[in-house]
A protein has these predicted regions:
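Small/aliphatic-rich secondary-structure junction motif
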Residues: 2-57
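Short, hinge-like loop/turn segments at secondary-structure boundaries
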Residues: 53-57, 108-110, 132-133
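Glycine-rich, Arg-bearing micro-motifs that act as flexible, cationic patches
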Residues: 113-135
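Short, flexible loop segments at boundaries between secondary-structure elements
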Residues: 142-149
Length: 149
């Protein structure tokens, strides 16, 4: 039995920290032989600020554009992980609350490690909003590798 995970869930969001997390996941995969699952979580329409101010058509258009951008970023991240020597198994585009969806997907996949970037929220914003990476660390069933800039 190996102490290294066979599956790594890389949670990405398009930020610079997420790109650094992708590098870390690639290196971990390369060194352990683990496969990498790359995930991006789009907020559901209910979670978007001001969603009730726009028509359904406008919201649908915004969400379609966001989904297209997320798919493009997911594919770029997967290619980058592969170019860096990581073994990419699959990409996952989910919708919902990012922290909850990351934890759910990690359990569903049987991931041994989650790799996620830290957005570096200041103390006040973190106290008011909480952070996705912080919530994932608290609720995940497996170790979480948080990458800082």
């Amino acid at each position: 039995m190996s102490i290294f995970p066979t599956k790594i869930l890389l949670a990405t969001d398009g930020s610079e920290e997420a790109r650094l997390a992708a590098q870390a996941a690639a290196e971990l995969s390369k060194n352990t032989g683990s496969e990498v699952h790359v995930a991006y979580v789009l907020p559901s329409p209910r979670e978007l600020r001001g969603h009730h101010l726009y028509s359904q058509e406008v919201m649908r258009s915004v969400l379609e554009q966001a989904e297209g951008e997320a798919r493009t970023f997911l594919e770029e991240q997967a290619k980058q992980v592969g170019k860096s020597g990581g073994k990419v198994a699959e990409t996952h585009l989910e919708t919902g609350e990012p922290d909850k969806e990351i934890v759910r997907l990690s359990e569903e996949l049987g991931a041994g490690t989650i790799v996620i970037g830290s957005r570096g929220l200041g103390a006040v914003r973190r106290a008011l909003m909480g952070g996705v990476s912080e919530s994932v660390v608290r609720h995940a069933h497996c170790p979480v590798f948080v990458v800082r800039e």
